């Protein structure tokens, strides 16, 4: 099965769907919103081509479920709020928003929500139906999506940790795994494995910046939020807990060791310094803002029961990783993986060691020399 076919969230609206298990991401989006407003404010000051008539925006790696339109709402509200602050504003610009993700993404679940979303925009923002136009642009964000110099603003949240492919060199010529017992570039991975993952991330992120800089107008903006490495040596991110759960099944005899050793996630969690260095090395963008912050896995969860919290965290992670796990290990073992995941989560949550480190970076496309 092709990798792109399983790089998606759980679709639909069932108990294990991303739509039902993505409340955590709403907390991240709330943290990003003030930075988004400032980014839009700077964008509207830049006087880009046609921006007073139609602002063209894309959400790269939009996923599905209510969070997709929550992101859209935040973008629209930010544009309208900043627009109201401008003097002599005569008319709101039309906003054209493209939702991007891989072809298997459950776009239909998003489209079903659009009629009520448009009505809500009209009621709460006074935006007439037709003044905000939302469509899909499926495809990999590591490839060209839009014409040259056609976009004003690109947004992406929690997507850049996904690589375009599993790094090469993780299996020797004799077919032996160089990342035994691990499923990504973890703290336990050998240095050659860590280098292979960093090299793949560097290649992919450089491609991402180059391609999308070509799609943006000069002075266009890009706002990226991603998971990043922290400095805490004993903290456990969700993939660490997932790795521990799968290893449990091997030790218990429910899963062959070879099955674990032949599995590597196409995921890399960069440090803030790595992201900064790649942006500077690629050269198309100026860094306007960079911040890191933590969000606990169970933040915003009101029930004070560690086991219920752990099940909640397990469901959130399952909604993200089930498709790719099921394609390799089979669907039957998925409940067992996340049952053990919840047990590990229940141990780290009371200690405050279960959280994501996050990075927000705001970028502006540098002008061409002829524009200066």
Swiss-Prot record:
Pfam families: Methyltransf_7. The record marks 155, 267, 331 as: Involved in substrate discrimination. Expressed in stems, young leaves, floral buds, developing endosperm and immature fruits (grains). Detected in roots and old leaves, but not in mature fruits. SUPFAM superfamilies: S-adenosyl-L-methionine-dependent methyltransferases. Disulfide bonds: none annotated. Xanthosine binds at residues 21, 25, 158, 161-162, 316, 321, 356. Keywords: Alkaloid metabolism, Magnesium, Metal-binding, Methyltransferase, S-adenosyl-L-methionine, Transferase. Pathway: Alkaloid biosynthesis. Binds 1 Mg(2+) ion per subunit. Mg(2+) binds at residues 179, 261, 263-264. S-adenosyl-L-homocysteine binds at residues 18, 62, 67, 101-102, 140-141, 157, 159. Its cofactor is Mg(2+). It comes from the Eukaryota. GO terms for molecular function: metal ion binding; methyltransferase activity. One of its GO terms (biological process) is methylation. Optimum pH is 7.0. Belongs to the methyltransferase superfamily. Type-7 methyltransferase family. Involved in the biosynthesis of caffeine. Specific for xanthosine and could not use xanthosine 5'-monophosphate (XMP) as substrate. Catalyzes the 7-N-methylation activity of xanthosine, but does not have 1-N- or 3-N-methylation activity. This is 7-methylxanthosine synthase 1. It comes from Coffea arabica (Arabian coffee).
